[in-house]
């Protein structure tokens, strides 16, 4: 092959590679939603789930860390009955978060104090977690919302 042909081939490969890299969208930031409001504040609780749902719908990876009274939100009776004023129904938000691959972490200490066990979380993408997991998630995720 002649030197000029080699140069042209090298340029063509570079242009094709650069075009393919530019066509690939940048990954969306991962998001952590930290919620401490529970059924006593349905609007704020549903708002946190609405934000997580919206992030899932926009293609973000989402984790939720529920602490304090918020751990009660994953009880089926609460999921089925809680609705915020202008922020929607908790069950609808939860189902979309789950379908989109969202993960829930519940403070183990808060859950224990409110009678929520790992058995009650069976079948849900949720686990009991210590404060060290909250810190780990806060450092790993690119954005964090707190309610």
Outline where the language-model segments fall.
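Bacterial N-terminal signal peptides
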Residues: 5-16
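Boundary at the C-terminal end of the N-terminal hydrophobic targeting segment
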Residues: 19-25
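A glycine-rich helix N-cap at a beta->alpha junction
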Residues: 82-110
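Short, glycine-rich nucleotide/cofactor-binding loops
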Residues: 26, 33-46, 78
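Ligand-binding beta-strand-loop-alpha-helix segment within the catalytic cores
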Residues: 105-106, 123-125
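N-terminal, post-signal-peptide region of Sec/Tat-exported proteins
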Residues: 44-82
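Solvent-exposed loop/turn segments at secondary-structure junctions
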Residues: 38-41, 69-73, 104, 110-114
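C-terminal partner/receptor-binding element of secreted or periplasmic proteins
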Residues: 126-147
């Amino acid at each position: 092959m002649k030197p000029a042909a080699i140069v042209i081939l090298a340029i063509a490969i570079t242009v094709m590679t650069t075009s393919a890299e530019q066509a690939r969208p940048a990954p969306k930031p991962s998001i952590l939603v930290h919620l401490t409001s529970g059924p006593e504040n349905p609007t704020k609780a549903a708002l946190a789930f609405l934000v997580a749902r919206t992030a899932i719908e926009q293609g973000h990876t989402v984790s939720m860390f529920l602490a304090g009274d918020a751990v009660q939100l994953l009880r089926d009776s609460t999921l089925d009955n809680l609705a915020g004023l202008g922020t929607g129904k908790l069950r609808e938000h939860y189902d979309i978060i789950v379908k989109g691959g969202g993960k829930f972490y519940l403070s183990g200490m808060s859950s224990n104090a409110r009678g929520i066990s790992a058995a009650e979380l069976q079948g849900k993408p949720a686990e009991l977690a210590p404060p060290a997991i909250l810190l780990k998630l806060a450092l790993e995720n690119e954005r964090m919302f707190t309610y």
